[in-house]
UniProtKB/Swiss-Prot annotation:
Protein localization: Cytoplasm
Family: Belongs to the ATP-dependent AMP-binding enzyme family. DltA subfamily.
Residues the entry annotates as binding D-alanine: D196, V300, K491
Keyword entries, A-Z: ATP-binding, Cytoplasm, Ligase, Nucleotide-binding
Gene: dltA
GO cellular component term of the entry, any: cytoplasm
Pathway: Cell wall biogenesis; lipoteichoic acid biosynthesis
Catalytic activities: holo-[D-alanyl-carrier protein] + D-alanine + ATP = D-alanyl-[D-alanyl-carrier protein] + AMP + diphosphate
GO terms assigned for molecular function: ATP binding; D-alanine [D-alanyl carrier protein] ligase activity
Binding locations of ATP: T151, S152, N291, T292, Y293, G294, P295, T296, D382, K491
PANTHER family (UniProt xref): ENZYME, PUTATIVE (JCVI)-RELATED, PTHR45398
Protein name: D-alanine--D-alanyl carrier protein ligase
Enzyme type, top EC level: ligase
HAMAP family referenced in this protein's UniProt entry, alphabetically: DltA (MF_00593)
Length: 503
């Protein structure tokens, strides 16, 4: 596999070069390669002969998690990243669903699985039992599953998305070829490894001999500590959710002076607000900003566009860009008919980035994946349209609501609320205590203003909204907060916000 070959090349040529760095840890390419060889050998000794069962890797962004990932795939087994924030009950469901035989505990914490179905070891124990003489014939390759990431399932049980070596290689090659991320760059890693956004920085960094700079959850929760670490990081490539960079932008000190070597910002995981992109262009004049889009089921991202001043000026909602060159993206109606440019429907993604399906879930796989025009395709469940080759994503189809007979998109309303001069960021929540939606609530982090009372601020925002939205789409209730809650993955936590504002 090209990715593993590239890591081996850097380990041989520059064994002392840093592959991983955080405030507390460092790992060279030589150490990464040697330790992962030993872990791979140890995995083979601790599992049944010929077994290809997945390996769970439990921890929080430690270097030995990446050692364990590589060790797993060198031993011919896919890995399943499990962050320490994931509840024990969910971990048990993942073990039962995946058939995993081995859990590598990197964090040092005890993992209460309540199950004798899985053996728990540390990477140090595996490395001590293993050796560095492992045949590359064992490596995961081509259609073999490289990693499995578990996402939320509508049944209440997590679904394991299988990403093959070919899926990952196609994605990594695209990032390294079509984005300005040349050899030896320092990449930010903000996303926990159980969130597939982390794949956007881990593997392009390793394939180009770069350094992965990890910022852990405890640093993110302390802005002063976070900014001190960022200042020392020498970051070139920033990858994160828009929500995370928006949180950083709330501090006026988040500028090119803090990150003088920042060259590119890459976003994925949720919609990039135009105001956030504009602020980045203002504060980081030497950096380029890219918006990308893609579900976990299509290997992180399958579209991209560089966000320029012209694109911001011409679009109320930013495009997610053009399809990855080897992918086909089109829009379908509910009857499976392809729609022409400009017509809104479901975004369908086809090509070599599409997952083979959900592990052990043939019925769910059959509903979400299908063959079309000789390619494997995926129903995203996202609404959107294509205009002049560019894809515009308009949120989840299931984010559509009906209010007093009117069908509307919550994310469309959020775009307009966020455009108010008085709003820093906002989330719109439907109030539906007994089934039907009764009205909308806007949870807002306001900009600095001169109003003495909240009702005066609300009136000013509503007046602005009235110029762009029909009355029935304007939220009835406005709640003001000092920040918007985020999930452990760095996305807006809509469920938690809803629970708070609906109390």
């Amino acid at each position: 596999m090209k990715l593993l070959d590239a890591i081996k090349t850097y380990a041989d040529a520059k064994p002392q070069a840093e592959a991983f760095r955080s405030l507390d840890h460092s790992l060279t390419y030589g150490e990464l390669w040697d330790l992962s060889e030993r872990v791979a050998s140890g995995i083979q000794k601790h599992t049944a002969d010929g077994s290809k069962a997945p390996v769970l890797v439990y921890g929080h962004m430690e270097p030995n998690m990446i050692v364990s990932f590589l060790g797993s795939v060198k031993a011919g087994r896919p890995y399943i990243p499990v962050d320490v924030s994931i509840p024990a009950e969910r971990i048990v469901k993942i073990i039962e669903s995946s058939g995993a035989e081995l859990l590598i505990s990197v964090s040092g914490d005890a993992v209460d699985t309540g199950s004798n179905l899985i053996k728990t070891v540390t990477p140090e124990e595996l490395a001590a039992d293993g050796d560095a003489d492992l045949s590359r014939e064992n490596w995961v390759k081509e259609l073999d599953t490289f990693y499995i990431i578990y996402t939320s399932g509508s049944t209440g049980n997590p679904k394991g998305v299988q990403i093959s070596a070919d899926n990952l290689q196609s994605f990594t090659d695209w990032i390294c070829r079509d984005f300005p991320v040349g050899e030896g760059k320092t990449f930010l890693n903000q996303a926990p490894f159980s969130f597939d956004l982390s794949v956007m920085d881990i593997f392009p960094s390793l394939q180009t001999g770069g350094t992965l700079h990890c910022v852990t959850k405890d640093k993110i929760n302390k802005p002063k500590v976070l900014f001190e670490e960022l200042e020392k990081s020498k970051l070139n490539v920033w990858t994160s959710t828009p929500s995370f960079v928006q949180m950083c932008l709330m501090d006026p000190g988040f500028t090119q002076e803090l990150l003088p070597e920042a060259e590119v910002f890459m976003f994925c995981g949720e919609a990039l607000p135009a105001a956030v992109a504009q602020e980045l262009l203002n504060r980081f004049p030497k950096a380029r900003v890219f918006n990308t889009y893609g579900p976990t089921e299509t290997t992180v991202a399958v579209t991209s566009v560089e966000i320029t001043q012209q694109i911001i000026d011409e679009n109320e909602s930013l495009p997610v860009g053009f399809a990855k060159p080897d992918m086909d993206i089109f829009i379908m109606d509910e009857n499976g008919n392809k729609l022409p440019d400009g017509e809104k429907g479901e975004i369908i993604i086809a090509g070599p980035s599409v997952s083979k399906g959900y592990l052990g879930e043939p019925s769910l796989t059959e509903k979400a994946f299908f063959p079309i025009d000789g390619q494997w395709a995926y129903h995203t469940g996202d609404a959107g349209y294509v205009q002049d080759g560019q894809i515009f994503c308009q949120g989840r189809l299931d984010f559509q609501i009906k209010l007093h007979g009117y069908r509307m998109e919550l994310e469309e309303i959020e775009v307009h609320v966020r455009q108010s001069q008085y709003v820093r960021t906002a989330v719109v929540i439907p109030y539906q205590p007994n089934g039907p939606v009764e009205y909308l609530i806007a949870a807002i982090v306001p900009e600095k203003h001169d109003f003495e009372k909240e009702f005066q601020l609300t009136s000013a925002i509503k007046k602005e909204l009235a110029a762009s939205l029909p009355a029935y789409m304007i939220p009835r209730k406005f709640i003001y907060q000092d920040h918007i809650q985020m999930t452990a993955n760095g996305k807006i936590d809509r469920k938690r916000i809803g629970e708070e504002v609906l109390v």
